[in-house]
Curated annotation (Swiss-Prot):
Catalyzes the activation of fatty acids by CoA to produce an acyl-CoA, the first step in fatty acid metabolism. Capable of activating medium-chain fatty acids (e.g. butyric (C4) to decanoic (C10) acids), and certain carboxylate-containing xenobiotics, e.g. benzoate. Also catalyzes the activation of lipoate to lipoyl-nucleoside monophosphate. Activates lipoate with GTP at a 1000-fold higher rate than with ATP and activates both (R)- and (S)-lipoate to the respective lipoyl-GMP, with a preference for (R)-lipoate. This is Acyl-coenzyme A synthetase ACSM1, mitochondrial. The lineage of its organism: Eukaryota, Metazoa, Chordata, Craniata, Vertebrata. Monomer. One of its GO terms (molecular function) is medium-chain fatty acid-CoA ligase activity. It comes from Bos taurus (Bovine).
Length: 577
């Protein structure tokens, strides 16, 4: 409990939520609309919006008036059993102090950029909201970054400040001389470091009195770096409208969160999904955000956490659910879990069914990008079509388009497009910062071209095929890599795979699979195993999709966000640099 005591002494606050309180029945079923804060509809465009004043401070007032149950706004734990519970009143106090540190101590102004590279620690929430209060543009980044990744982000963004931990401080120091815009370095640590400001002590001594800026809905709020699967990461710039979209009724239907919910998003803090799932979505509904520090991913710890804490909803990548299912537990019937959502990579229909069978909870799928947030999904309570990404979520009008922006009929392969004309929808990125060429490149007629390929069926459900650059044209047949990778994943030998096109003197292109084997299959004869895997794919999907070439590898090239870099493998196949 030493760390817990440090938090209490450090921030100078009392722990107002010593235990978890189930909401009174009359509050338990109240969603955002029931709390009287749903001021906008799906297609409204208010002139002003600020998540800190319109959401966080609203729930602070609800707590003062006794209109919200005494559950914490943020419930943070670590693997040592320490806990931090902050109410909305405490979050308002601490984020106002943070805002004053950023503006008064650091001298940052509205529109300045701040690089935020923190793990799942409470200070991540303070900095995010502190930036929103002041109009400082925050740029989340994963702690998996190396010095060259940090250098690139600091240089292209012109960041004036960075907030990180002592683990990454040496990496920052090694590149700081090459970043002339960087003026302020804030350290989140129990130890001081020369050349760095002590974030915690500054927040503790700062004034809690702060007037939130009156931000325009279309003023910039955050920059999210894309995954960089096809080149250097781009800076997708988002307005305050990105946070406003979580207010809209159609978006509320995706998770249908209540004040009594305890919501756990397992996304890395450097990804846009964390901003949505660990900040915007749950707090818009007045729910409790649950966070586990999880310095190392361990499915056993995740399972034990579900049993130990009253978590009601979960949002995580398919790999998280997959690893949970692979553990040898006699029961996965978590006592309070009601709803699960996933996205970010392909999910096998068999995995959805297995999750439902072992946990008794349905697993809903969603789709999005750094540019869009969650743009379509299977809403809670909606019919699940296993393997589908669900339907478009307003205000996004999503269609399947060709390369000229023409809408395609159902069951026809094309690009996933989001209508941007005559009006760009609230919640879609503004543009790629400092990259007008790329911004223009993704505009296709009346649509933003996501670069992802899919089909849409007669009921409006989308079916993902892959990135446009990833789709393989084999002997006239178009093959999406996700289809083949899903088929391979059903075989027990395959830990993970990446499917790309490979040159062939007769067919032009053929399907090739790079496969990482599970350890127990590593001693198998490669030739025999290749034939077995090829036959397996033929048996579970259209035979023309099977990989004519197979290469076993120890690992796959990935971006720092964990996405497979198929482009790198494809270039290798075609002898490109």
């Amino acid at each position: 409990m030493q760390r817990l005591m440090k938090f209490r002494v450090l921030w100078g606050i009392h722990m107002s939520c010593p235990g978890f309180h189930h909401a009174p029945q009359h509050l338990r079923c109240r969603s955002l609309s029931g709390a009287g804060t749903l001021r906008w509809n799906d297609y409204d465009r208010p002139e002003e919006f600020n998540f800190a004043s319109d959401v966080l401070d609203h729930w602070t007032q609800m707590e003062k008036e006794g209109k919200r149950s005494p559950n914490p706004a943020l419930w943070w734990v670590n693997d040592q059993g320490d806990e931090v519970k902050w109410s909305f009143r405490e979050m308002t106090d601490l984020t106002c102090r943070t805002a004053n540190v950023l503006t008064q101590t650091c001298g940052l102004q509205t529109g300045d950029r701040l690089a935020l590279i923190l793990p799942r620690v409470p200070e991540w929430w303070l900095v995010c909201v502190g930036c929103i209060r002041t109009g400082i543009i925050f740029m989340p980044g994963t702690t998996q970054m190396k010095a060259k990744d940090i250098l690139y982000r600091l240089q292209v963004s012109g960041a004036k400040a960075i907030v990180t931990t002592d683990t990454l401080a040496p990496e920052v120091e090694s590149v700081a001389p090459e970043c002339p815009s960087l003026k302020t370095k804030l350290l989140v640590s129990d130890h001081s470091r020369e050349g760095w400001l002590d974030f915690r002590s500054l927040v503790k001594s700062a004034s809690p009195d702060h007037i939130c800026i009156k931000s325009k809905t279309l003023d910039p709020m955050a920059i999210f770096f894309t995954s960089g699967t096809t080149g250097f990461p781009k800076m997708a710039k988002h307005s305050h409208g990105f946070a406003l979209r979580s207010y809209f009724p159609a978006c509320r239907k995706l998770l249908q969160l209540k004040m009594s919910d305890v919501f756990w998003c397992l996304s890395d803090t450097g990804w846009i999904l964390a901003a949505l799932g660990s900040l915007l979505e749950p707090w818009t509904a007045g729910s409790t955000v649950f966070a586990h520090h999880l310095p190392q991913f361990d499915p056993k710890v995740i399972i034990e956490t579900f049993f130990k804490y009253p978590i009601t909803q979960c949002l995580a990548a398919p790999s998280v659910y997959r690893m949970i299912l692979q553990q040898n537990y006699t029961s996965l019937r978590f006592p309070t879990l009601e709803h699960c959502c996933t996205g970010g990579e392909a999910l096998l229909p068999e995995e959805q069914e297995q999750w439902k069978r072992q946990t008794g909870v349905l697993l809903y799928q969603a789709y999005g990008q750094s540019e869009t947030g969650i743009s379509c999904g299977t809403l809670r309570g909606m019919k699940i079509k296993p393997g589908s990404m669900g339907k478009a979520i307003p205000p996004f009008d999503i269609q399947i388009i060709d390369d000229k922006g023409n809408i395609q009929p159902p069951n026809t392969e094309g690009n996933i497009g989001i209508r941007i004309k005559p009006t760009r929808p609230i919640g879609l990125f503004m543009y790629y910062e400092n990259n007008p060429e790329k911004t223009a490149e993704v505009e296709c007629g009346d649509f933003y071209n996501t670069g992802d390929r899919a089909t849409i069926d007669e009921e409006g459900y989308f079916w993902f095929l892959g990135r446009s650059d990833d789709v393989i044209n084999a002997s006239g047949y178009r093959v999406g890599p996700a289809e083949v990778e899903n088929a391979l994943a059903e075989h027990p030998a395959v830990a993970e795979s990446a499917v790309v096109s490979s040159p062939d003197p007769v067919r032009g292109e053929v399907v090739k699979a790079f496969i990482v084997l599970n350890p127990e299959f590593s001693s198998r004869d490669p030739g025999e195993l290749t034939k077995e895997l090829q036959q397996h794919v033929k048996s579970v999907t259209a035979p023309y999709k099977y990989p004519r070439k197979v290469e076993f590898v120890s690992e796959l090239p990935k971006t720092i966000t964990g996405k497979i870099k198929r482009s790198e493998l494809r270039k290798k196949e075609f002898g490109q640099k």
